[in-house]
UniProtKB/Swiss-Prot annotation:
Belongs to the bacterial ribosomal protein bS20 family. The keyword Protease does not apply. The gene is rpsT. Gene3D superfamilies: Ribosomal protein S20. One of its GO terms (molecular function) is structural constituent of ribosome. This is Small ribosomal subunit protein bS20. It comes from the Bacteria. PANTHER family: 30S RIBOSOMAL PROTEIN S20, SMALL RIBOSOMAL SUBUNIT PROTEIN BS20C. GO terms for cellular component: cytosol; small ribosomal subunit. Keywords: Ribonucleoprotein, Ribosomal protein, RNA-binding, rRNA-binding. Binds directly to 16S ribosomal RNA. One of its GO terms (biological process) is translation.
Length: 83
């Protein structure tokens, strides 16, 4: 447990950031899974879910949660599925 005041503050800040990052990643993964499930089932709203998944991937990459190359690779794979 940190003793220095600034280190104590950092622990609190990191905890908040970890929760925020985990929530963002979960949202991204859920959007991708929803699209894949809809595409496999041949649902009508697959194109809307595709756009939502791409948006979540871009948001995660821009915030540094995933590497930009991973986002691009995942988007490419989703686009291939969408065709």
């Amino acid at each position: 447990m940190p003793q220095i005041k600034s280190a104590i503050k950092r622990v609190k800040t990191q905890a908040v950031a970890n929760e925020r990052n985990a929530a963002q990643l979960s949202t991204m993964r859920t959007a991708v899974k929803k699209f894949k499930a809809a595409q496999a089932a041949g649902a009508d709203n697959a194109s809307e879910l595709y756009v939502a998944a791409i948006r979540e991937l871009d948001k995660a990459a821009s915030k540094g949660l995933i590497h930009k190359n991973k986002a691009t690779r995942d988007k490419s794979r989703l686009a291939k599925l969408a065709k």
